[in-house]
Amino acid sequence: MNVCFVGCGNIAQAMIDGLLSNGISTSSIACIERNQRKVELLKEKNLKVIELDNLAKENFDLVILAVKPKDALSAEKNIFQAAPNSKILTVVAGIELNKYSNPNSVIRSMPNTSSAF
């Protein structure tokens, strides 16, 4: 299974750590992140960091939307423009499915950072 995280904050990091500790290879996980400090940390974990424009080329089974709520709707639109057949799992708090541009292709989940423990 190939997974791409769009946004790699605390919840995404907890999910990535969980995937890695359960045997998912780093080669199966990619990240799209704007914060250069986080990009360096992701690369230290041997995770692939890609640009949104390359999303369609990578052929991911699942794209996990883990950005701040203020960025979620535009990020989701950009994901569908870059890779219209993407399945999206959103972990963004406070945004109902009907607010997304393609709500039938979005799955909503609400983990929290204590899930890491």
Task: State the predicted function of each range.
Residues 1-52:
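NAD(P)+-binding Rossmann beta1-loop-alpha1 motif at the extreme N-terminus of oxidoreductases
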Residues 45, 52-117:
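Rossmann-like NAD(P)(H) cofactor-binding subdomain of soluble oxidoreductases
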